[in-house]
């Protein structure tokens, strides 16, 4: 089964070798007939501490690295 890849924005880089990535998804609400934005934060492994707050990154699912980390940062995307 392929590993999931998500895109999001780094919102915290205070932990060693860890960044917190906020991933936003949009969906149509069945009753309100509106587009709703929902976000979720994922802790992702950043081996070299190279990503900073505000960077747009791709994260990939991985085997558990710690209690909360199950994602690895792949690449930094051009924000835009």
Swiss-Prot record:
Gene Ontology MF term list: rRNA binding; structural constituent of ribosome
Q: What transmembrane ranges does the database entry give?
A: none
Query: Which N-terminal residues, if any, form the signal peptide?
Result: none
Top-level division of the source organism's lineage = Bacteria
A Pfam match: Ribosomal_S17
Per UniProt, the keywords (alphabetical) are: Ribonucleoprotein, Ribosomal protein, RNA-binding, rRNA-binding
Q: Please give the GO cellular component terms listed in this UniProt entry.
A: cytosolic small ribosomal subunit
Biological-process GO terms, alphabetical: translation
Similarity comment: family membership: Belongs to the universal ribosomal protein uS17 family.
Main function: One of the primary rRNA binding proteins, it binds specifically to the 5'-end of 16S ribosomal RNA.
Cite the record's note on assembly.
Answer: Part of the 30S ribosomal subunit.
> Which NCBIfam families would you find in this protein's record?
PRK05610.1 (NF004123), uS17_bact (TIGR03635)
Q: Which HAMAP family match?
A: Ribosomal_uS17_B
Q: What is this protein called?
A: Small ribosomal subunit protein uS17
- The primary gene name is rpsQ
